[in-house]
Regions:
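Terminal amphipathic alpha-helical/low-complexity segments used for targeting or macromolecular assembly
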Residues: 1-58, 176-187
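Short-chain dehydrogenase/reductase
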Residues: 11, 60, 136, 154, ...
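Arg/Lys-rich RNA-binding interfaces used to dock onto structured RNA substrates
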Residues: 49, 63-66
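Flexible, glycine/small-residue-enriched loop-and-beta-strand segment within the central core
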Residues: 65-75, 80-149, 174-187
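C-terminal/domain-terminus segments
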Residues: 152-164
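Acidic, glycine-centered active-site loop in nucleotide-sugar glycosyltransferases
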Residues: 165-167, 172-175
Length: 187
C-alpha cells in the first residue's frame, strides 16, 4: 500500500494532514526559515543543496523563498533566482541547466478537486512541473500544475503558463501564448 507521500508525488489524491507529510512540512519550515534568515550567500546555498531533492553545484537563490517540502525540487546547474521565489512542490518541480528566474515567480504543483464535496473532504492532488534547459522567466511569472516546457523558453514578465510548450519560444500573457519563435543557432 502506498504512503500518502508516495501518492502525493505520483499526482494521486492524498491526505495532506498525514503525520509523515506534516513532519516533512515542519522540517521544510525550519530549513526555509534558516535559509531566509541567512545573510551569507555561500551558507544559504549550502542549506539549499542539503535540502532540495537535487541541485547543480552552481546556484544562487535570493531570500524570501517559500516551498511546501523542498525535497521534491530538482534544479540543474547554473540556477539563479531573484527575490520571492515560490515553489509549491507537492509533485516534483524539475528545472534544467542555466535557468534565470525573475522576482516574484511562482511554480505551483498543488490542485484541489472541483467538486465541492470532494474538495471539502480534505483530499488534494497535484501535477509535476518540468522545464528544460536555458529557461528565462521575467518577474511575476506563474507556472501552473502539469506544465512541461522545452529548452530555450523565455517567459515574459507576468506570464501565466497554464499549458505545455515546446522548445525555442517566447511566451507572454494570461494565459501565456507563443508571441515569438527563437531562431536556433548551430552548435
Amino acid at each position: 500500500m502506498k504512503t500518502e507521500y508516495q501518492k502525493m508525488i505520483a499526482g494521486e489524491p492524498y491526505h495532506p494532514f498525514d503525520s509523515e507529510l506534516r513532519a516533512l512540512a515542519q522540517t521544510a519550515r525550519q530549513k526555509q526559515a534558516a535559509f531566509n534568515e541567512e545573510v551569507d550567500p555561500v551558507k544559504g546555498m549550502e542549506i539549499i543543496k542539503g535540502w532540495f531533492g537535487s541541485t547543480g553545484e552552481k546556484l544562487y537563490i535570493n531570500t524570501r523563498l517559500m516551498v511546501d517540502y523542498g525535497v521534491n525540487i530538482h534544479l540543474g546547474e547554473n540556477f539563479y533566482s531573484n527575490w520571492n521565489l515560490t515553489m509549491l512542490d507537492v509533485c516534483p518541480i524539475t528545472i534544467g541547466d542555466n535557468a534565470m528566474i525573475g522576482p516574484n515567480c511562482q511554480f505551483l504543483t498543488p490542485l484541489h478537486p472541483l467538486d465541492p464535496d470532494e474538495r471539502n473532504s480534505g483530499l488534494e492532488f497535484g501535477k509535476p512541473i518540468t522545464i528544460g534547459k536555458n529557461f528565462w522567466a521575467g518577474g511575476g511569472v506563474i507556472v501552473l500544475p502539469g506544465v512541461t516546457l522545452g529548452d530555450n523558453v523565455v517567459a515574459g514578465a507576468g506570464a501565466v503558463i497554464t499549458k505545455s510548450f515546446g522548445d525555442n519560444v517566447v511566451l507572454a500573457g494570461n494565459p501565456a501564448r507563443v508571441i515569438k519563435e527563437i531562431p536556433v543557432k548551430g552548435n
